[in-house]
Amino acid sequence: MKDFNDKVAYITGGSSGIGLATAKALSTEGAHVIIFARKKDCLEHALEEIKSKRISSSQRFSCMTMDVSNWDEVQEVMFRAVAQFGVPDVLINCAGRAYPRVFEEINYEQFDETMKINFHGIWHTTSALVPYMKERGGYIVNVSSIAGFIGLFGYTDYSASKFAIIGFSEALRSELKRYGITVSVLCPPDTDTPGFHEENKTKPEETKAISGSAKLMQPDEVARALLAGMRKEARHIIPSFDGKLIFLLKRLLPGLVEFVMDSTIKKVQAKRGEK
């Protein structure tokens, strides 16, 4: 998609972080932006930020509360959105959560919630909108993570959900080409968002050591990289150099990647007196 001017963009998780940054970036490109999230007050505050970036008085903006993990609610909200704002040219599935901890500390309810928000949520919104979008084509971006192509200590549930997103997106890209719908998957690194700071409250020391070796990106940097990747219709959009390198090495030299990660983990555990 070369031009976002006058395009209708739906963004889940659009009230903060990468979703909000992307909404603002699209606003500066002349797009009509509709954001979705669970908290109405956060949505309304975000909407004012997005409107402030507009380049034309003809641009339309709105927000709608929605829990992406609730299939019935997604169907109902998306039906109303299409009736009010039209079929989206762009769907960006950005809603997600992470609550890092080691596998044995995760109960089933926590695992289920992570999968429902991160992966099922993408399936829900995509399923609700593809029947409309296939009539005229469009663009779908699903947000995964670097943890979607490399399993990380402390992220057994999160990595599982993000791996699923990549597989889903690659298969969907193949299926929807015939309808003129392009599908990309965004794999950002650690990004300076409210969610990232919440993660740090529960993140195991091993996880902090691994993630601390890479550059922390800003949401607007990720948003710029996303739009650039969409213009190229890239299959995988990986904003950081570190991420691109890991993506390549994981495929060519997986043993080396595992060795480096294991070495980092062992150093942290040795400091605690573990063997």
Predicted feature residues:
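Residue(s) in the substrate-gating loop at a strand-loop-helix junction
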Residues: 145
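SDR active-site lid
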Residues: 178-241
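Conserved glycine-rich Rossmann-like NAD(P)H-binding loop of the short-chain dehydrogenase/reductase
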Residues: 31-46
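The beta1-alpha1 cofactor-binding region of Rossmann-like NAD(H)/NADP(H)-dependent oxidoreductases
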Residues: 65-76, 108
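Conserved glycine-rich cofactor-binding loop
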Residues: 8, 15-17
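Active-site helix of classical SDR
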Residues: 126, 161
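Substrate-binding pocket helix/loop in short-chain dehydrogenase/reductase
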Residues: 102-103, 107-112
